[in-house]
């Protein structure tokens, strides 16, 4: 179970975040980083699905 706390707008303004693209890639304001374990899993799973379905599946976010 997760503990969730509601933040005020002032508290939200102090949070510096980035964007997670769902495939192991996360980008912030000035740079991006890759979780290679997650990225490798996505590449293998998407490749297998694309092969098994003749290219109709396999481009989903992991």
UniProtKB/Swiss-Prot annotation:
<keyword id="KW-0078">Bacteriocin</keyword>
<dbReference type="Pfam" id="PF01721">
    <property type="entry name" value="Bacteriocin_II"/>
</dbReference>
<dbReference type="InterPro" id="IPR010133">
    <property type="entry name" value="Bacteriocin_signal_seq"/>
</dbReference>
<dbReference type="GO" id="GO:0031640">
    <property type="term" value="P:killing of cells of another organism"/>
</dbReference>
<feature type="propeptide">
    <location>
        <begin position="1"/>
        <end position="18"/>
    </location>
</feature>
<feature type="disulfide bond">
    <location>
        <begin position="42"/>
        <end position="62"/>
    </location>
</feature>
<feature type="disulfide bond">
    <location>
        <begin position="27"/>
        <end position="32"/>
    </location>
</feature>
<keyword id="KW-0044">Antibiotic</keyword>
<keyword id="KW-0614">Plasmid</keyword>
<keyword id="KW-1015">Disulfide bond</keyword>
<dbReference type="GO" id="GO:0042742">
    <property type="term" value="P:defense response to bacterium"/>
</dbReference>
<keyword id="KW-0929">Antimicrobial</keyword>
<comment type="function">
    <text>Bactericidal activity (effective inhibitor of L.monocytogenes).</text>
</comment>
<feature type="region of interest" description="Hydrophobic">
    <location>
        <begin position="40"/>
        <end position="52"/>
    </location>
</feature>
<protein>
    <recommendedName>
        <fullName>Bacteriocin pediocin PA-1</fullName>
    </recommendedName>
</protein>
<dbReference type="InterPro" id="IPR023384">
    <property type="entry name" value="Bacteriocin_IIa_CS"/>
</dbReference>
<dbReference type="GO" id="GO:0005576">
    <property type="term" value="C:extracellular region"/>
</dbReference>
<dbReference type="InterPro" id="IPR023388">
    <property type="entry name" value="Bacteriocin_IIa_dom_sf"/>
</dbReference>
<comment type="similarity">
    <text>Belongs to the bacteriocin class IIA/YGNGV family.</text>
</comment>
<dbReference type="InterPro" id="IPR002633">
    <property type="entry name" value="Bacteriocin_IIa"/>
</dbReference>
<keyword id="KW-0964">Secreted</keyword>
């Amino acid at each position: 179970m997760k503990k969730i706390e509601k933040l005020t707008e002032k508290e939200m303004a102090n949070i510096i975040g980035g964007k997670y693209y769902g495939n192991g890639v996360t980008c912030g304001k000035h740079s991006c980083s890759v979780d290679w374990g997650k990225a490798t899993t996505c590449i293998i799973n998407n490749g297998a699905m694309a092969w098994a379905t003749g290219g109709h599946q396999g481009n989903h976010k992991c």
